[in-house]
Structure formats: C-alpha cells, structure tokens
Curated annotation (Swiss-Prot):
Family to which the UniProt record says this protein belongs: Belongs to the universal ribosomal protein uL1 family.
Name the UniProt record assigns to this protein: Large ribosomal subunit protein uL1
Gene it is expressed from: rplA
Organism annotation: Orientia tsutsugamushi (strain Boryong)
Organism classification: Bacteria, Pseudomonadati, Pseudomonadota, Alphaproteobacteria, Rickettsiales
Subunit structure and binding partners: Part of the 50S ribosomal subunit.
Keyword rRNA-binding: yes
Highest taxon in the source lineage: Bacteria
Cellular component terms per the entry's GO annotation: large ribosomal subunit
Amino acid sequence: MLNINNKIAKGGYVYSKNIRLAKSKIDKQKCYDVREACSIIKEISFAKFNETVDIAIKLGVNPSHSSQVVRGVAAMPSGTGKTVKVAVICQEEKLDEFKTTGADIVGSLDIIEAIKSGNIDYDVYITTPAMMVAVSQVARILGPKGLMPNPKLGTVTNDVAAVVKKVKSGQVEFKVDKAGNIHAGIGKISFSIDEIEANINALVSAIIKSKPSEAKGTYLNGIYLSTTMGPSVRLEISNFTESGNERR
C-alpha cells in the first residue's frame, strides 16, 4: 500500500511521464508546417480538460521604443472557444438603442461608478467617443488590466453593434511584451485542425500587417504552438512569409 507521500510522488511521475511521452513525438530541430503542428498538438494532448491552444511569437522589434510597440486585434474565424462578457458605456439617450446590440450590460455613469467601487465583471468594455471624457475617470483602474477602451482596438466607436458582434464572435487582442514576444490563446484543443489552422493564419497575418515601419530586418523570428499543459512545437516561418509580407 502506498503512503500519502508515495501517492503524491506517483502523481508527479504520471505527469512527467506524459510530458516525456509528448516531447518524444516532437523533433526539436525541426520547424513544422502549420497543419502538421496542429495535428501534433492534438495527438500529444494528455490533459483531462479542454486545453487552450497557445501561440508565442518572437518579433524583431525593440519595444522600449514606442514607435516599435506592436499592438492590435485579430478576428478569429473559428472563434476562441470562450464566452466573452461585454459591457457598453454610452450616453443616456443611447441606452435603448444599444440594448439591442447583444452586449451583456449597457449603461452610462452607473457602470463607471461600479468600476470605481471595484466591480469589474466584464471581459471587454466598449464606449462611444462622446463618453471618453467620463470613462477616463477609471483609466487607472481599467488600464493596468488591459480593459480600457481604446480607439486603436476598435473599442471606442459609434458603431457599437458591429463591435459587440465582432467581440462576441471571437477575437484576440495582441500586444508585444518587453522582451519582444507576443503570447495569445487562439482556440481550444477540441477545435478541428482546420479551425486551429485558420485562427493561427488570421493572427499571424494581423501581426504582419501591424509591423512598425521603424522595425528593420527580420520581423518574425520564431513562432511556437502549444497547449496549456503540453510542450511547444516550432512552426516554419516561411509558411507565413512566402508572399513577402514579412518585410516592408
């Protein structure tokens, strides 16, 4: 009979055994075609939950220069597999109109006051240009959480219905970190290979289009695909640059 310490050790052994088995099916010296990489991560997935499919992209930019910060939004053709809660902050006279957009909540100053009180219950906040002065009162609260409405991300708009629809259907916000990397969840392991591949292509395409004019040399330096618990698979960059999109 195993004692409790042995049981814990056995659990750790099972996990590490699964990782070793998964890693054994990946050639670390090889860069994989996108479709083959999607197939591999599905094959080696061992977690007992619906893992997120993650992508990590190393960019040839210097984020310490504001002109080389890469940021944007990519619509995921296959969705993200997540339920996104959306809040719309608008003028009082627009409340009835925007309540038909499909947002989870539509309000005005009441939502701003709720945020001030620490009630931040939504994944995306959308507002109109006319409300930006009022919304700026909570910029220090929403900003560090990546929730502040931003014209560059499309979340400051008069076309609220279209943006709510886009957000609800699935999109990924991306921003390069201090090390020059972009990390994003682009779907679930339960997605088909076609669905994962479509989302990868959509995200990388959006990142290529967001290349700063000041960034010189190689833009895409490495792309890795993985799941929440699994090892990473390196992708062949030429899959995305054959048309010359990498360089401007």
